[in-house]
Amino acid sequence: ATFGAVVDQLAHVGGRVILTGMGKSGYIARKIAATMASTGTLAVYVHPAEAAHGDLGMISKNDAVIAISNSGETTEMADIIDYVKRFQIPLIALTSQRDSTLGKRGDQVLVLPPHREACPIGLAPTTSTTATLALGDALAMALMVRKGFTKQDFGVFHPVSYTHLRAHET
């Protein structure tokens, strides 16, 4: 998939953009969901382990799911992936491994470039999480542009920040 194709799909979602990920990818997914929600794209985070305990009901046929996993093999995401495939809910995969389970099951796949984690022993998610966050922020900003989200719209979702910024404009 191309970045533009993913933006097109997300811009036309009739429901919400659901983000999911486990561990460090889950923290990144939460941040991306928060950025999207505060910039005009209805988005929420669903924890993949909680999904199998009833939270799958948070995902509707009008939604699209962005699943984040560096390896693409996060076992806790199996139930949420099975659910969205069963009900033909669009699945966008963000992973470093196109040939992974997630990469193969995604309707659209955005593959992160090859990288080495910045951690001295090369294991702690550092480079991968930074790249994923940058990609998620880029999606949110592209959706802002696509939807014509304005400074005034921003003020509606950020009344305290917006009032403070307006007070300090020259």
Question: What do the predicted segments below correspond to?
Answer:
Residues 1-2, 21:
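Charged/polar interaction segments and conserved charged motifs
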Residues 2-12:
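A short, well-structured juxtamembrane/interface segment
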Residues 11, 16-22, 26-134, 140-143:
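Glycine-rich phosphate-binding loops that contact phosphosugars or nucleotide phosphates
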Residues 134, 138-162:
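Long, charge-dense, solvent-exposed interaction surfaces that engage phosphate-rich ligands
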Residues 163-170:
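Conserved small/polar residues in nucleotide/adenosyl-binding loops
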